[in-house]
Amino acid sequence: MKYTVRIIISIAFLFSFSYVKSQNYHNIESNFSLDDLSISVKQKSNYVNQTSNKLSNIIIYDWNNSYSSIDSPLSKKLYSEYDSSILKSNSNQRGKTVISKILVNDKIVKWKRIPNHNDLIEIQLNQEIDSEERIVISFEYDLYIPNFVLNYGHKNNFINLKNCFLRFSPFINNQWLILSNQGLDDQFMVKSNITLKINYDSELHLVSNLDKKASYLSGNILSETYKGTLISDIFLILTDDQEFKKLSLNKINILTNSLSLIH
């Protein structure tokens, strides 16, 4: 089934809480499975304390897990707006993030999901980090993609994902921004440099706002590398619709399968 979808991503004017120069980066290695609609991820994230405070914890956004529970802030918002699509889904259809490992500078740390915010993770650092100090956080986790809700998820070999990978919360006014995903466009991601390596079935077509740097076919698996500088949001579309394209118009990236735009 083909979807007539046009997603416009404004790079020049996208508002976010971020720094002009990012010292944060995410190196993400991922494998997409069409069989169970999951993405296994190994991620190394470089974090520099750009505040004037000593930090004893780090807050991570896990937007994919917003869809995992009928008690999540996102589900409650949908219910209040008379959208019961998540409530009607069973647990396998709602999607979730399963984290198997979090290390800071190669050492085990304690972490938890913040009460009443199942899409926020608090990492307790083994020792405080000073201003301008750098740490490397290693994650291993699996993303299970939910049924299509609020333009996120999967339906009939069409998969649309926005900010599915783990990202840093902004630190504003001497505190972390504790803000759950509510399905809005104004998701406050810290601008970061991104390297994404993804393996997926070659019968699918991947489009992203990131720049493709390499592509390699081995059997029926495509291995591709994407990069982005000072990126707020990461958009991924996996589809069997080969007409999806990425266009750049006046510093605005457009992901579209609208023939009137492509031709």
What are these regions, as identified by a protein language model?
Residues 82-96, 100, 113, 140-237, ...:
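Extended, low-hydrophobicity, Ser/Thr/Pro/Gly-biased non-transmembrane segments
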Residues 40-66, 71, 80-83:
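Ligand-binding face of N-terminal immunoglobulin V-set domains in extracellular IgSF glycoproteins
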Residues 15, 19-40, 48-54, 157-159:
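N-terminal, polar/Ser/Thr-rich
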Residues 196, 247-263:
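Juxtacatalytic substrate-recognition/specificity segment
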Residues 6, 22-24, 62, 226, ...:
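Hydrophobic alpha-helical and helix-loop surface patches within well-folded domains
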Residues 130-139:
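Short Pro-Gly-centered flexible turn/kink motifs
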Residues 1-9:
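Bacterial N-terminal signal peptides that target proteins for export
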